Amino acid sequence: MSKNFNHEDFSHWIFDLDNTLYPASVNLFGQINTKMSNYIMKLVNVDQETAEKMRAEYWEKYGTSLAGLMQNYEIDPKDFLKVVHDIDFSVLPKDLDLLDALNNLPGRKLVYTNGTVPYAREVLKYRGLLSVFNEIYGIEDAGYIPKPFPEAFEIIFSKAKIVPNSSAMFEDEERNLVVPFKLGLKTILVSNVKSNEKYVNYSIKHLSDFLRRITSNPLK
């Protein structure tokens, strides 16, 4: 990088929720995927295999399966999200190490998820991280327009008063970092699969380790 990553230069830290603020190995989203497939089976009257294919195709094309269902079947997003977020959160372990690392970051800490705010609050509560975040934004705050679409980021970043060149975005999905990078944010992919995309400034496996590193010494 041409400039060091000095944590003192940042005023806003924006974190995705699912598979970013908890490990993907927990497979919380596996529960949600099952609920979504069941919803589609009943809505469209198709078998499980077809429903799972539709769910995946809608996610790829529309950003979320919900967005695809809204576009093609005009469903009530509130009803859908209430159903698919009725899951067992107790599989989420508390993470005091991550809590400590987040507490050491200066500035404001935000969660921005394609889930809902109530869902995000439940996840953070079970992880023991709820108290550390200043603001939480969900898909409902963007009029149900999901990441990775530019309109979604424009709406949320405007509401949160994000200053791009002094903000960082953490995500587990590469495609959700394209717009933040173009806007001037520092972008960090949290994934076991390393990224070499130019719009990913840092590709990391362990969030808490990375946060400790940047609060100890500036990164290049």
Regions found by a protein language model. Give the residues of each.
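Asp-based, Mg2+/Mn2+-dependent phosphohydrolase catalytic module
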Residues: 1-10, 116-220
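N-terminal helical cap/lid subdomain that shapes the substrate entry/recognition surface
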Residues: 3-15, 20-97, 118
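Short glycine/serine/threonine/alanine-rich loop segments
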Residues: 46, 75, 107, 162, ...
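Well-formed, non-transmembrane alpha-helical positions, independent of function
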Residues: 68, 101-104, 179
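Substrate-recognition element of Asp-dependent hydrolases with the DxDx(T/V) motif
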Residues: 79-93, 99-127, 133-139
